[in-house]
């Protein structure tokens, strides 16, 4: 089923709700980067987190970049997501696998804390106007959801609850997504709204299970948690907005990158190989720069 994002409000407009499905985007990233199950889940969580953040931007070309710099064996990650629902990203060590950790009598989970280690979450919000806004917070435990909640608390001072998860069955990711619930800025001093948000969130025992049981129906997922949802707040556009793994790379961007090299470097490439192959870190697309194209770059620098 196509990934998508839904926005709504509850409590008479006092609480903002956003739910996102990133299953297909995660599987596309797995295919392109050769990800393990662990790194597929981590990148899928980062996809969900970045899309949830981007959902509040007022313009469709607004973008959010999440970067994790840490000392764990994952070797960091970078995700770029837009208000338009397009997302892309990569991890430093795509093949990483770790032993599962026991979280209950008969339940096990990926060791996200060990994978990411200690470090920082860097968030860049680019509205397309002026300088991008950058903020950095320490990683809480590497499960992405709590790290994002920490960012929202420290950087935006907004009472928020973040749930991000996935479910794996028969060696495949069958659902991945997230939910963001925020008390809106004009209401963030209302103790009743904050209490309502806390009470609703306490009822979530396993977000991954709730996501799976909703059968990809994000509206049902939201309604199960916030039955007092304001139906009028859900526009047709919000109901149908798609989310997908989409990269902005192109042959022209590759040519522009090559043009940044010194003349001597271009001459060395031409002499040794007669061509160059550029690989996009975000999506692994390959672009061949041929002999004539490199020669033209050299001539233009003469």
Curated annotation (Swiss-Prot):
Compartment list: Cytoplasm
Disulfide bonds: 247-249, 280-283
The entry's keywords: Chaperone, Cytoplasm, Disulfide bond, Redox-active center, Zinc
Sample GO molecular function, one term: unfolded protein binding
A Gene Ontology BP annotation from the UniProt entry: protein refolding
Main localisation: cytoplasm
Keyword Membrane on entry: no
GO CC aspect terms: cytoplasm
PTM notes: Under oxidizing conditions two disulfide bonds are formed involving the reactive cysteines. Under reducing conditions zinc is bound to the reactive cysteines and the protein is inactive.
Functional description taken from the UniProt entry: Redox regulated molecular chaperone. Protects both thermally unfolding and oxidatively damaged proteins from irreversible aggregation. Plays an important role in the bacterial defense system toward oxidative stress.
Assigned protein family: Belongs to the HSP33 family.
Protein name (record): 33 kDa chaperonin
Species name: Prochlorococcus marinus (strain AS9601)
């Amino acid at each position: 089923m196509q990934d998508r994002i839904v926005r709504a409000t509850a409590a008479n407009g006092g609480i903002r709700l956003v739910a996102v499905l990133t299953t297909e985007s995660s599987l596309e990233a797995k295919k392109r980067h050769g990800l393990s199950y662990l790194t597929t889940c981590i990148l899928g969580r980062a996809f969900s987190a970045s899309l949830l953040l981007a959902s509040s931007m007022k313009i469709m070309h607004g973008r959010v970049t999440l970067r994790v710099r840490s000392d764990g064996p994952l070797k960091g990650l970078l995700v770029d997501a837009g208000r338009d629902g397009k997302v892309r990203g990569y991890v430093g060590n795509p093949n990483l696998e770790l032993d599962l950790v026991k979280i209950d009598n008969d339940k096990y989970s990926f060791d996200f804390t060990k994978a990411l280690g200690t470090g920082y979450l860097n968030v860049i919000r680019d509205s397309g106007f002026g300088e991008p806004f950058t903020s950095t917070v320490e990683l809480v435990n590497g499960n992405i959801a709590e790290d994002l909640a920490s960012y929202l608390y420290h950087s935006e001072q907004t009472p928020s609850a973040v749930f991000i998860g996935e479910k794996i069955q028969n060696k495949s990711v069958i659902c991945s997504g997230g939910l963001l619930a925020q008390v809106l800025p004009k209401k963030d001093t209302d103790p009743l709204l904050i209490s309502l948000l806390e009470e609703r969130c306490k009822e979530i025992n396993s977000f991954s299970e709730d996501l799976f049981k909703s059968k990809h129906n994000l509206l049902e997922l939201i309604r199960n948690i916030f039955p007092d949802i304001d139906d009028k707040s859900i526009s047709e556009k919000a109901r149908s907005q798609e989310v997908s793994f989409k990269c902005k790379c192109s042959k022209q961007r590759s040519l522009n990158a090559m043009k940044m090299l010194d003349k001597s470097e271009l001459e060395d490439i031409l002499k040794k190989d007669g061509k160059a192959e550029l690989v996009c870190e975000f999506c692994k697309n390959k672009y061949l720069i041929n002999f004539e194209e490199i020669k033209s770059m050299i001539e233009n620098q003469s």
